[in-house]
Regions:
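STAS-typified acidic loop motif
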Residues: 33-45
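Glycine-/small-residue-rich active-site loops that bind phosphorylated ligands and cofactors
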Residues: 42, 64, 123
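Conserved short strand/loop->alpha-helix "switch" segment adjacent to the catalytic nucleotide/phosphoryl-transfer site
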Residues: 47-73
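Conserved beta-strand-loop-beta-strand hairpin that lines the nucleotide-binding pocket
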Residues: 1-33, 77-164
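Short alpha-helix boundary/capping segments
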Residues: 38, 59-62, 126-130
Length: 164
């Protein structure tokens, strides 16, 4: 990956032999942002983006594949309908045609933070659900939060030392 910077223009310098040289920073570095229709037909774009970013960071192929699955599952949680008659409804109505999901990839000092945000799903993620269990197995401890009518699911993946 020598010579390629994932930073925004002007935030780092380029050394032809060592690749990007970044000034120390306290804030995360935004690697990619993708906003897409909240529709299952667009999940392939989210999966491919996750694979590409993880590959650029030098993660082993097994972790790249795990992150692809985790991003797919995280996005799918926003598309899921109620699981039964007792399912807690978080959003009484939403305009499905205009709903979008936003997928963000941020580089922290030693971690990749992936967040998916969008309109509140019809049901809160259930810790006993297969999807949530898969997320926990793939990325450890996903974090779910709701703020101002927007749900955000955050995944964190360690980055091997000496990479990107």
């Amino acid at each position: 990956m020598n010579g390629i910077s994932l930073d925004q223009p002007g935030s780092g310098s380029l050394d032809r032999e060592r690749g990007p040289v970044d000034a120390p920073r306290a804030e995360p570095r935004r690697l990619a942002v993708m906003t897409f229709a909240a529709d299952k037909d667009y999940l392939a774009l989210a999966r491919m983006t996750a694979m590409h970013v993880a590959g650029l960071l030098g993660l082993p192929i097994g972790r790249v594949t795990d992150l692809r699955l985790a991003v797919d599952e995280a996005c799918s949680l926003f598309l899921a309908g109620p699981s039964g008659p007792d399912a807690p409804l978080l959003a009484s109505s939403r305009a499905a045609e205009s709903a979008t999901l936003t997928l963000r990839f941020d580089r922290l000092a030693e971690h990749l933070r992936i967040s998916v945000s969008g309109p509140l799903p019809l049901r809160r993620p259930d810790e006993d659900d297969l999807g949530w269990t898969m997320l926990c197995a793939l990325v450890g401890s996903p974090r779910w939060e709701v703020r101002d009518g927007v749900g955000t699911l955050t995944l964190t993946e360690p980055i091997p030392t000496g990479r990107a």
